[in-house]
């Protein structure tokens, strides 16, 4: 029997496999891809015979988060999962962007290929974890994979080391004149990255051509617009451009 295991993403508050809180409290069914994430809301506990007495369960300055689990990240345990005979890895993709799915899937694919080739997983792990942090995520741990979590959850927000800038709509064998659909602001001279199925390639952005006006410019605002830019290696449709998140940029 082939076994699949969930390895990466949000750990939901559920009962008998049915996500109930979102449907009951917001009228949005998690099983239909519309989860309102009520597990992230603030709660207090009230005992039936003590109305009005709000008791903390796990409190910080913002309140309690009794349903808010850390995200699951089993990348550090991947060798053990492979040795155990796991045949399929499940990665959360519901309500996620294409950039998120591409980033996380590529990291796990790279890790699996490394293990299959007999590579040094321990040496590669820091880089793999850093790659996962390039997609929007919450604080994570290994959940119950190693027993009861030491810190099962909290009020952590989203983190992201890279932001999605554009994606390729028409590739080029030599990279010249690659057509991109612009999604976020960047400028010529910035160090940016191209995320492809074969890996992540770093280069310096060059001035680009606005297709609708024919202008060659160094920077553009946010918006859906087709641009052409030379890239120093081959590109293909679906590749992603990304850069440091704005608060990290110089």
Q: Where does each model-flagged region fall?
A:
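Surface-exposed amphipathic alpha-helical tracts and adjacent flexible/coil segments at the periphery
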Residues: 1-250
């Amino acid at each position: 029997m082939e076994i699949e295991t969930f390895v990466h993403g949000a750990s939901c508050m559920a009962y008998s496999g049915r996500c109930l809180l979102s449907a009951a409290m917001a009228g949005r069914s998690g099983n239909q891809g519309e989860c309102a994430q009520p597990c992230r809301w603030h709660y207090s506990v009230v005992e039936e015979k003590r109305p009005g007495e709000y008791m903390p369960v796990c409190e910080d300055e913002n309140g309690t988060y009794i349903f808010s689990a850390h995200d699951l990240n089993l990348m550090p345990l991947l060798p053990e999962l492979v040795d155990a005979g796991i045949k399929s890895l499940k990665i959360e993709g519901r309500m996620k962007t294409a950039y998120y799915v591409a980033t996380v899937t590529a990291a796990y694919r790279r890790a699996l290929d490394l293990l299959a080739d007999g590579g040094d997983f321990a040496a590669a792990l820091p880089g793999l974890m850093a790659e996962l942090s390039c997609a929007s995520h919450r604080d994570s741990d290994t959940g119950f994979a190693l027993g009861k979590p030491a810190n099962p959850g909290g009020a952590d927000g989203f983190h992201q080391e890279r932001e999605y800038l554009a994606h390729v709509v028409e590739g080029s064998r030599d990279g010249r004149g690659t057509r991109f659909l612009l999604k976020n602001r960047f400028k010529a001279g910035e160090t940016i990255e191209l995320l492809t199925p074969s890996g992540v390639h770093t280069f310096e952005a060059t001035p680009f051509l606005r297709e609708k006006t024919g202008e060659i410019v160094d920077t553009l605002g946010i918006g859906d617009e087709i641009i052409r830019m030379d890239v120093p290696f081959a590109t293909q449709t679906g590749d992603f451009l990304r850069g440091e998140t704005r608060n990290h940029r110089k």
